[in-house]
Amino acid sequence: MPDPLGQVFSALADPSRRHVLGSIAQAGSRTATELAGELPMTRQAVSKHLTTLADAGLVEAERQGRETRYHLTQVGAEWDDRLDALARHLRGRSG
């Protein structure tokens, strides 16, 4: 039986995927090429991370002409908010 929560935790365990998720959240949507231009990784690496995030139900792909744009799902947006809140909490504790 699939473990959806385990898939989400596995996807979010990688700092690069958390960065991809945050970038999409800020912009509303992004292509793999746009993400590769702002992150220190290749387009192929970004595509692999996007596939993992999509498999976990955090992002969805939408074909627009020759490009595929990725946006957060409702679940992805909720997890992004939770991660932001956790980061603020941890920064407050260390300062």
Model-predicted segments: where are they?
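Generic cytosolic/nucleocytoplasmic N-terminal low-complexity/intrinsically disordered segments
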Residues: A45-S47, D81
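Base-recognition residues in the alpha-helical recognition helix of bacterial helix-turn-helix
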Residues: G22, S47-T51
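Alpha-helical residues within the helix-turn-helix
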Residues: G37, A54-D55
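N-terminal helix-turn-helix DNA-binding core of bacterial DNA-binding proteins
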Residues: D3-T42, Q64-A77
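Actinobacteria-biased recognition of intrinsically disordered, low-complexity terminal regions
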Residues: M1-Q7, L90-G95
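A conserved amphipathic terminal alpha-helix motif
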Residues: W79-G95
